Amino acid sequence: MLDPKFLRNELAVTAERLATRGFILDVAHLTQLEEKRKSLQVATEELQASRNAISKSIGQAKARGEDVDAIMAQVGDLGAQLDAKKVELAAVLEEVNAIAMSMPNLPDESAPIGADETENVEVRRWGSPRSFDFPIKDHIDLGEGLNGLDFKSAVKITGSRFIVMKGQIARLNRALGQFMLDLHTTEHGYTEAYVPLLVNEASLLGTGQLPKFGEDLFHTKPATEEGQGLSLIPTAEVPLTNLVRDSIVDEDELPIKLTAHTACFRSEAGSYGKDTRGLIRQHQFDKVELVQLVKPEDSMAALEVLTGHAETVLQRLGLPYRTVVLCTGDMGFGSSKTYDIEVWLPGQNTYREISSCSNMKDFQARRMQARYRVKADNKPVLLHTLNGSGLAVGRTLVAILENYQNADGSVTVPEALRPYMGGLTQIG
């Protein structure tokens, strides 16, 4: 959520910067609402002051033995007018809030301006794609050939975009998650967390999935009088970041660095027809998430560090990748700047996203009222929040199967994973 003061004082600038994201802000309507809000606010305060002043005179009139019926009637009339103005003001504030909640974050000035993914900017590459002297198989053929990926059973049990893994491939998938967690906790300074896979609406509002992206979620329990609705998490970013919702942490606690390995659930409502085969786009998938909560002046540097943590996973696994900075038109709703890390997939002969690392600045923190107390003046200030995949486990599995395949259909286990595989060097 954007800063209301900045929005009011710099409306034209806000509209201009949001336009680079493809979001058209109705400046005229918002200006009209703001004028109406001011007018109603003044009227409400004046009516409140008048009613209070006249109410005080009732006791004085009674003390003098005067008839107070007329004054009581006047107070009642002012009260009715005040109630009516409060209703009007609440309606205007609700509309303004709805508009504010629908606005994406302002892009950082360092984010390249562009309309879509074709205008993203590559910033670096690591490793060189392997040259094969035999016909390349994709991860689907490799996994099925090794009796490790069972798409048919998943369709029978649940439906499309799910997977059953078996044997050493299931073990490799588990090893990947453990390897990532160990790397981030022992070398990168993150604290591991075990978090709920079901979250309430307040949590999804806090991180920005609601109200705009409700159709992308799996909702398991509707809201009732007894409690809020629950939804399966689309990413562990939601529960991890919400750990500081409605909180004020001490400055000495920062930065807070959290990681979790969870299943994630997405309806993929907007991706009909995309990646219909294989593990690239599943309704249920594993991911190791990285979250950092930092002081505002530290967040841009923290984004570079967090992105480096995700890249380190690929380097340790020997997987070629490139890192691109997203242009304004391709960034996620809550992001001010995002790096996508794309791993090389020989089966597709292209780089595919395996991690997205973003600086949300105070966009999520304002929604969540997540703050820290500055030691110098003891005042609470909004945190800056960052998140990134470190990494998407299923897509990393895809990359290993395809990059480490052998001519006979077997797959070499990357050296970094062998301790997690009981010393196994090859699958198949």
UniProtKB/Swiss-Prot annotation:
Which positions does UniProt annotate for ATP binding? 266-268, 353-356
- Record SUPFAM superfamilies: Class II aaRS and biotin synthetases, tRNA-binding arm
Q: Which Gene3D superfamilies match?
A: Bira Bifunctional Protein, Domain 2, Serine-tRNA synthetase, tRNA binding domain
Annotated positions binding L-serine: 235-237, 289, 389
Report the pathway entry. Aminoacyl-tRNA biosynthesis; selenocysteinyl-tRNA(Sec) biosynthesis; L-seryl-tRNA(Sec) from L-serine and tRNA(Sec): step 1/1
Any one GO MF term held by the record is: serine-tRNA ligase activity
Among its keywords, does the record have Ligase? yes
**A Pfam family per the record:** Seryl_tRNA_N
Question: What is the catalytic activity of this protein?
Answer: tRNA(Ser) + L-serine + ATP = L-seryl-tRNA(Ser) + AMP + diphosphate + H(+); tRNA(Sec) + L-serine + ATP = L-seryl-tRNA(Sec) + AMP + diphosphate + H(+)
Q: Where is the signal peptide?
A: none
Q: Which GO terms describe its cellular component?
A: cytoplasm
Q: Which PROSITE patterns match?
A: AA_TRNA_LIGASE_II
Keywords for this protein? Aminoacyl-tRNA synthetase, ATP-binding, Cytoplasm, Ligase, Nucleotide-binding, Protein biosynthesis
EC number from the UniProt entry: 6.1.1.11
Q: Any one Gene Ontology biological process term?
A: seryl-tRNA aminoacylation
The protein's superkingdom reads Bacteria
Instruction: Look up keyword Ligase and say if it applies.
Output: yes
The cellular location(s) given in this protein's UniProt record come to: Cytoplasm
What is said about the domains?
Consists of two distinct domains, a catalytic core and a N-terminal extension that is involved in tRNA binding.
* Function comment: Catalyzes the attachment of serine to tRNA(Ser). Is also able to aminoacylate tRNA(Sec) with serine, to form the misacylated tRNA L-seryl-tRNA(Sec), which will be further converted into selenocysteinyl-tRNA(Sec).
The annotated subunit structure for this chain is: Homodimer. The tRNA molecule binds across the dimer.
Give the record's family classification. Answer: Belongs to the class-II aminoacyl-tRNA synthetase family. Type-1 seryl-tRNA synthetase subfamily.
Protein name listed in UniProt:
Serine--tRNA ligase
Protein's organism? Shewanella oneidensis (strain ATCC 700550 / JCM 31522 / CIP 106686 / LMG 19005 / NCIMB 14063 / MR-1)
* Gene it is expressed from: serS
